Swiss-Prot record:
Protein name (database record): Tyrosine--tRNA ligase
Catalyzed reactions: tRNA(Tyr) + L-tyrosine + ATP = L-tyrosyl-tRNA(Tyr) + AMP + diphosphate + H(+)
Gene Ontology MF terms in the entry: ATP binding; RNA binding; tyrosine-tRNA ligase activity
Name of the gene this protein is made from: tyrS
Tree of life domain: Bacteria
Biological-process GO terms, alphabetical: tyrosyl-tRNA aminoacylation
Enzyme Commission (EC) number: 6.1.1.1
Length: 428
């Protein structure tokens, strides 16, 4: 990062600006420290990979001396931003409160809220329920609603799609007004002059910019980040099982998180390095050269996975998952893995539940590595069956208590690359 580089220059070379209001005016404003915000509705107990770019954007701005505000949508989260299909489930205040506590902890991995830290502009966390709950219906209609054209609101893509299908409730239809009012409140209270968000938030962001102009005569700004997809054009952040990739390690293990990024396609890995990491322009250019010249080494993917796991889960978790990956291929000792890391690594494969008297043939079949005992017998005879990285040559072999990892686990392998796991219980 150049000492003379403006944050907007940084975002531009990284390709992080999708849409924005007057970009030159924003660049001029960011010559001095500004306050910006991004909102996160606590509709779940964890943020997910789809939140990564806005989260990391807040961190980038803070590194350049600007003050980030993270807005927890305690009020808007009870309503829900309209989505393309169907109404959202309504959450209780208690659920929202519990989710906010969990999400605050995740936000701390990205921005520094500490007043006495070395950061010039410590982040602030606010809850829009604190001001929205104080507003009565008359104030809402008079001070907010009168500034919005129904024609403009109906023209929003999501609203149009909902009206053409199953309709939309007035509750969700009002979301845009409440979010716009958040921006007015934050401008008045914190002199906030920039809102950032995902591309799907552009309509809401522009509404807030316009409401500030109408109510305060203020010139504020808005910026959205690019839509992130995988190499096949699918929505970014879906795990191999099809579910979301969560920041909470109890929902998505650090091993699964690491594996998602190390499996990034060559066509997207450089974009991911620009968007998600804090590597310099020169470092990324060097990795881009290696992708072009030696893609089989997958060095860019390894760097990406390491950077992203360290950012979200910490350096110790990164070391553990890299050790697990090495151990599965016999390049490190399986006995050195703690049980949670071993278990999460094996959850990426089939895990068989077997009795203590299971033979190698039982293990190969029950784990799905072979379809029949006849095929399993051939694999053993050809020297292709491994348990805990040890070749098994006896078709009658059963594990001893000493061979069980953490008292119950076995790592099975057929050939060089096909893995499975087994949990051994009492004899059947």
């Amino acid at each position: 990062m150049s000492d003379n580089m403006n944050i907007i220059d940084e975002l531009q070379w990284r390709g992080l600006i999708n849409q924005s209001t007057d970009l030159e005016a924003l660049k001029e404003a960011t010559q001095n420290p500004i306050t910006l915000y991004c909102g996160f509705d606590p509709t779940g107990s964890s943020l997910h990979a789809g939140h990564l770019v806005p989260l990391i954007m807040l961190k980038r701005f803070q590194q350049f001396g600007h003050r980030p505000i993270t807005l927890a949508g305690g009020a808007t989260g009870m309503i829900g931003d309209p989505r393309d299909v169907g109404e959202r489930s309504m959450l209780t205040e208690e659920q929202i409160g519990e989710n906010m506590v969990a999400i605050k902890k995740q936000l701390e991995a990205f921005v520094d809220f500490t007043e006495d830290s070395d950061v010039d502009s410590p982040a602030v966390m606010v809850n829009n329920a604190d001001w929205i709950s104080q507003m009565n219906v008359i104030e809402y209609l008079r001070d907010v609603g009168k500034n919005f054209s129904l024609n403009t609101m109906l023209d929003r893509d999501t609203v149009k799609r909902r009206l053409e299908s199953d309709g939309i409730s007035y509750t969700e239809f009002s979301y845009m007004l409440l979010q716009a009012n958040d921006y007015v409140h934050l401008h008045n209270e914190f002199d906030c002059v920039l809102q950032i968000g995902g591309g799907d938030q552009w309509g809401n962001i522009v509404s807030g910019v316009d409401l500030n102009r109408r109510v305060n005569g203020a010139k504020v700004h808005g910026l959205t980040v690019p839509l992130v997809t995988d190499a096949e054009g699918n929505k970014f952040g879906k795990s191999t099982g099809g579910g979301k990739l969560w920041l909470d390690p109890q929902l998505t293990s650090p091993y699964s998180w690491y594996q998602y990024f190390i499996n990034a396609g060559d066509s997207v890995v450089i974009d991911y390095l620009r968007w998600f990491t804090f590597l310099s322009q020169e470092e990324i250019a060097e990795l881009e050269r290696k992708v072009a010249e030696e893609p089989f080494k997958r060095e860019a993917q390894r760097v990406l996975a390491r950077e992203m796991t360290t950012l979200v889960h910490g350096a110790a978790a990164t070391e553990a998952v890299e050790l697990a990956a090495q151990a599965l291929f016999g390049k490190a000792e399986l006995q050195d893995l703690d049980e949670p890391t071993l278990a999460s690594a094996l959850q990426e494969t089939e895990v068989a539940e077997v009795g203590a008297d299971a033979t190698i043939l039982d293990l190969l079949v029950e784990s799905g590595l072979e379809k029949s005992k006849g095929a399993a017998r051939r694999t053993v005879g050809e020297g292709g069956a491994y348990v805990n990285n040890q070749r098994i040559e006896d078709i009658e072999w059963s594990p001893s208590a000493e061979e069980l990892l953490h008292g119950s686990w076995l790592v099975l392998r057929k050939g060089k690359k096909r893995f499975a796991g087994a949990r051994v219980g009492a004899s059947s």
